[in-house]
Amino acid sequence: MRCPFCRGDDSRVVDSREVEDGQAIRRRRSCSGCGRRFTTIEELVLSVVKRSGVTEPFSREKVVRGVARACQGRPVEEDALQQLAHQVEDTVRSLGVSELPSHEVGLAILGPLRELDEVAYLRFASVYRAFSSVEDFEKEIADLRSLRGAARLPEGPEAAQGGPESKAGNGQAAGSGDPEGVKAEKSSE
């Protein structure tokens, strides 16, 4: 590594650490010629290949801007957008490639955005997947509803038996007309 001070070619690594959650390596170096120390940061340059064939460096800020447009008017904090962009970057870096198509970045955005805000997800998906009809929206909404329903299914032995509460959800024991049934049932637990 060439010294930035004396331009000498001989330097040695004094310290080496991972930074940015392991996405880069920070090395502290010492020049054998002038004795001065300097720091280098090594990271994998992640490039995105656009549909036009143009290659550009991955930009977390560009992910934030794109998702922010989809979240316009929605109750989504800037911090949540930054976290989503970081999650997307981690996902695409974990693929282990130095170049990836922009399509892969879009796929990496969809999952976290769906969990962040469903309306913003629909907006983003409509552009990303080029929805061309109302039916495309209806299908995506139906998919969202089925995912939401699957995520909220009760678990455990009470779920199989219908649980201790009535279907009305009023806190009364099933088959009981008064709240005393709840107290008696809870005290026997």
From Swiss-Prot:
This is Transcriptional repressor NrdR. Negatively regulates transcription of bacterial ribonucleotide reductase nrd genes and operons by binding to NrdR-boxes. Residues 46-136 form the ATP-cone domain. A zinc finger (unnamed) spans 3-34. Belongs to the NrdR family. It comes from Saccharopolyspora erythraea (strain ATCC 11635 / DSM 40517 / JCM 4748 / NBRC 13426 / NCIMB 8594 / NRRL 2338). The keyword Nucleotide-binding applies. Its cofactor is Zn(2+). Residues 152-189 are annotated as: Disordered. Keywords: ATP-binding, DNA-binding, Metal-binding, Nucleotide-binding, Repressor, Transcription, Transcription regulation, Zinc, Zinc-finger. One of its GO terms (biological process) is negative regulation of DNA-templated transcription. Residues 180-189 have a biased composition (Basic and acidic residues). PANTHER family: TRANSCRIPTIONAL REPRESSOR NRDR (PTHR30455:SF2). Pfam families: ATP-cone, Zn_ribbon_NrdR. The keyword Transcription applies. Binds 1 zinc ion. One of its GO terms (molecular function) is zinc ion binding.
